[in-house]
Structure formats: C-alpha cells, structure tokens
C-alpha cells in the first residue's frame, strides 16, 4: 500500500496529459492585451480599487512626464520615514502605535495609545488548552501552514465567527493581531520538539512587553534579549506592516472579503498567499542564497568573484537553479525601496554590535553588484534595486530567529495591514471582485462514451 504522499507513475502520466491540454500560447496574451499579473510591462499595476490605508510613490511628474524617483511609503498619509524617525527619537517601541494608526486612520494620543495597548494585552491569550490541543498535538514542518491551521481553528472558539459587522470584525482583527506572535513561536516550538527532537519550552507573554519583546521572550529559552535587539525587531515589524492594496496577500484579503466570508477564512487566505516564495517567502530565500554564496566564494571582498557567481545564479547553474537573485527588484519600486533603506541602517547598527560586520559588507557588495549583473544578463523594463527582503534575513539571523520563522515574522507584522484593508472593504460595501478571463477554447462536438 502506497504512502498518502506518493506521486505514482499513474499520477505522472495524468499530469503530463493535463499539461499538454493546458498550455496557452504566450503570444495570445499580447494579442488580447492581457495584463498578466495585473501589471503592464513597465510594472505599473492595473487599477482595481481605491484605498486610504497607505500610499506608495515610485515616480513623480517632471515637465509633464512621469519619471522614476526614490520610493516613498506613507501610512494613512504619514511618511514612514517620519514615523520611524519619531519613534527612534523617543527611544520607544512603536508597533502598537502604528497598528492603531492603520486601523483607525489617526495617530493616538498618550491616553488612547495606553488604552489600545491594554486592549492588545487583554486579547493576547489563546483559548484554554488551545496550545496543547491544536498547536502541540499536530506540529507542522511549515510554520505558515501551522499558523493558518490555528487561525482557522480559532473560528470554532468564536461565538460569532460569521458576523461581518464592523464591530465584530474589528474585535476579531485585534484579537488576531494580539495572538499572532504566540501562534508563530508556539508553532515553531512544537515543530522543534516533535519533529526535530529538541527540548520543548512554552513561555507566557508578559503583559508589560511590546510585541517585539513578546516574540523574543517567547522564542528564547532564557527569555533574555537586549534593548537594541528588541528595538530593531520592532522597526522591522513596522516596515512590514502594510504596503498598499495591490500586493498579493492584501489583494487576496480584498478579494476574499468581498465574497462576504468570515475573518478567519480571509486571514488564512492571506497567509496562504504570503507563504509563496514570490511574495513573503522571498526573505528566507535571500538568506539561503547568501549561505550558498558564502560557501562558494573564497574572497568575500573580490567583486569579480562575486559577479561571476551571481551570473551563475542567473544562468540557473547553481543555488536553487531558478535563475533569480532574491531580494533584488520590486513590482512597484524602480530606484529604491524606502523600507529597505531604513532597515539597512538598523541592520548595520546591529551587525556592528553583534560582530557581523563581514556578513554585512558581503550583503552590501552583492546589493551593489547584482543590478549590474542583472542588467547584462536580462532584458529589463525598469530599474532593479534591493527590496525590504534583502536585509531582513540577515537581521533575523542576528536575532537568532530560526529560518522557519522568517515569513511568519512578516505575517505577524502584515496582519495589521490585512485587518485594515478587510475593514475598509467591509465599510465601503464593495461588489464581489470578479475580473474577466477570456476563453480560448475550441468548440467540440460531444462524443458518446462508447465511441471515444
């Protein structure tokens, strides 16, 4: 009797049949002006909706023409550079404050922020025995699947899971934002213990801790962390919280929400999207790529040797043979990703404190050389610059966050943006999202079964 997961010869034969009858002539996309990926060749997205949650600027008008510019990102009209700068100047944690901003559209005052933090702490608890019965009893080797399963199971513990009124959805969203750190870290501990035979420890979240502190304290055996570590993680969370309505996972949130489904299902769908290596899964790909580079390059300061190896990566001769230099390029930004610029400064500071100077310098060299290599080897329609994923893997590794949690860290931040967009979709009572697909099928006469 074969395993549940076996791909048998029969399945292979059926797969080949499916492929032969499913291929579409790529020239037809141009013929019918299909916007593959809902984007033009220059990367400009097809306008499918309106949002007041965030603003992304990648070009500006000069002499009546749009020209690429350094990227800018605004949360509810506030420049992210200013938000992060203000938080750094005050030497405080800011994730919870920015969650408030994204959800409610305005900056909280001191009293409002305190009340909101208290609300997050109140909801930072899972149902009785949930960790034992749901997370520990069915560990997964993929943390994104573990989180999605936990989110869907929370539906069963909610007395009003299908109520899509604004009040109820807001309550559900705040609860999910509060428990995502625990779903992520506890899921990892279950995997680490039951599938890797490591020690198991489950810490409780302290009510006085920020979200970044909760993550580090739950993850580490001794619960210890430095203020710098927690502040840098807090910044990374802020920079990953939101990025417009058109990114794959947030657009998924809009699409699924427009059907009228519940919050848990919409969030699970967004998680499934973010898991993909072309979206949130790219950060761990960057880290693995650099681990491969370190193994194969003798002199980390030799530009020529680095260029040669990057060319091999592009030509599918090494690493994962996908032909991609991960962390380079973005669907929207052309010249620079503002999140990457902010994060890079924090990563450099942490690298110096933790003794990762040589690693950081290697990342900088690849960041400088990769656009040149891509420009020589590929036909590109817009500029190529490093994105926020480029340095995030190095950051997480310096924080001793395991690779299995890289994308869940992204999700722990982005749940705030997903929640804001879900609420925006509900408040504005939009139509169900249903774009057009053109059929290119050839009409055929039906043949009775015995005559085929």
Question: What are the functions of these language-model segments?
Answer:
Residues 1-452:
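Non-transmembrane, aqueous-exposed alpha-helical and coiled segments at domain scale
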